[in-house]
Amino acid sequence: MVIISSEVTICECNQVRVAKIQDDGDVLTSLLGEHDGRAHKLAIEPGSPYIFYSCGEDGLVQHFDLRTDTATELFICRNSLTKSGYSSHVHLNAITMDPRNPNIIAVGGSNSLARVYDIRKCKWDGSSDFAQPSDCYCPPHLIDNRSVGITGLAFSHQSELLISYNDEKIYLFPKNGGLGPDPKSSTKIEGNEGSKSAMFTSSESVDRSAPQVYVGHRNCETVKGVTFIGPNHEYVASGSDCGRLFIWRKRDGKFLRAMEGDECIVNCIEPHPHVMTIASSGIDNDVKLWTPSANERAQVLNVEELKPRKRKAKLWHFALPEELVWHVLASRRRQSAGEDSSADLEDNTELLNLVLQAADRDSLSDDSDEDEETSDCSGS
């Protein structure tokens, strides 16, 4: 990830580290904290060079203060509410802070809900890892969609919330456009259509207008961030699987620019907090800085005319076939029954062949999808 700060804070695998750039150009790093799983994103407190928050695939949100080099575990983001309590944690990819209110943070990850928390209500003494969200945001058509997740979040200067989904689009919600603390699980517990419809219409003060949508990029391969740019956050920016940096006008979603940012994929985009400079990074081994210094005004492109770039990397989508699952279960039963090791060897050989056959089928399936992916750069 990329963060622009007086001291460059970074996430490396499951570690949260601080890197201090010396006068001679050397960089010294020190460990501040860890997650049980990868840590994708940090959120720096607006106006503070010392305080920031991290989130990780363990669902944990941590608070850091560089003046003390200590980490405080605030809460674990839970998936949904059941009669017996909150279920398994959400694998978090994104965290952001409201620049108008540093007590408000939003997190998102392995499901469709972006959850907003008031950190003043968290247990800072470690007595509990539970925290109730104050609000949740999600496009109505994605509320029950289990195939999408959130890869990027950003608050604007107007407290609007920007959400980027994998295999989907980018959505902008007004400040009062949330669905309540736990809309998804509330319908499960009450279990009738009347309560469900009442949940969405109970408050006339909530802005239920359709969110602004930004389309044209492709967000399928990796975890991509999203951000606002401009002195008053007039624009929205995101990376794409086609190796470009996309820019839209915030107020109406009009596509403005697509700039070549990486040989493969652009993942991270961060604006400088004070000057008009953008940092971007992706699969390449460098970070690129962008400034509005062109001598001529750029021509506005038609997003439908953008040609995709051949990817150098591909994520494999591997699903265990039914016969492989049954074979594993049968092998386990035979081993527990004490059958001889020669049979186990034959089982393992057969199991390996099944895995290779499944991988071959998955490869052919991916190859057949290439024609669909090369129609344009848009995932829409």
Can you say where each PLM-predicted feature lies in the sequence?
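Conserved beta-strand position repeated across blades of beta-propeller domains
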Residues: M1, A43-E45, T96-D98, A154, ...
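Conserved blade-register residue in beta-propeller folds
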Residues: V18-K20, H63, V116, L172, ...
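Solenoidal tandem-repeat scaffolds enriched in leucines and small polar residues
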Residues: S30-G126
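Tandem repeat protein-protein interaction scaffolds
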Residues: M1-V8, E12-K20, D24-G25, H35-A43, ...
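Generic preference for well-ordered alpha-helical elements
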Residues: T9-C13, G25, D36, S54-E57, ...
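Conserved strand-to-loop turn within each blade of WD40 beta-propeller repeats
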Residues: T9-C13, I21, S54-D58, L66, ...
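Structural hallmark of WD40 beta-propellers
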Residues: I3-T9, R17, L28-S30, S48-Y53, ...
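Terminal intrinsically disordered, low-complexity extensions flanking WD-repeat/beta-propeller proteins
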Residues: R78-L81, V90, S112, K121-L161, ...
